[in-house]
Amino acid sequence: GLPICGETCVGGSCNTPGCSCSWPVCTRN
């Protein structure tokens, strides 16, 4: 639900807990 996690997920995965990949960036729920 919240905006960008400050992480990109061009490779398809996010390392930051609670973040999911909304290509090409990670977003929080």
UniProtKB/Swiss-Prot annotation:
Q: Which cystines does this chain contain?
A: 5-19, 9-21, 14-26
- The leader peptide range reads none
Keywords assigned by UniProt? Disulfide bond, Knottin, Plant defense
> Does the keyword field hold Disulfide bond?
yes
PTM info: This is a cyclic peptide.
What PROSITE patterns does the annotation carry?
A: CYCLOTIDE (PS51052), CYCLOTIDE_MOEBIUS (PS60009)
Q: Where is this cross-link: Cyclopeptide (Gly-Asn)?
A: 1-29
Which InterPro entries does the protein's record reference? Answer: Cyclotide (IPR005535), Cyclotide_moebius_CS (IPR012324), Cyclotide_sf (IPR036146)
Q: Give a GO biological-process term.
A: defense response
The function of this protein is:
Probably participates in a plant defense mechanism.
> What the record says about its domains?
The presence of a 'disulfide through disulfide knot' structurally defines this protein as a knottin.
Please state which protein family the record places this protein in: Belongs to the cyclotide family. Moebius subfamily.
- What name goes with this protein? Varv peptide D
What is the source species? Viola arvensis
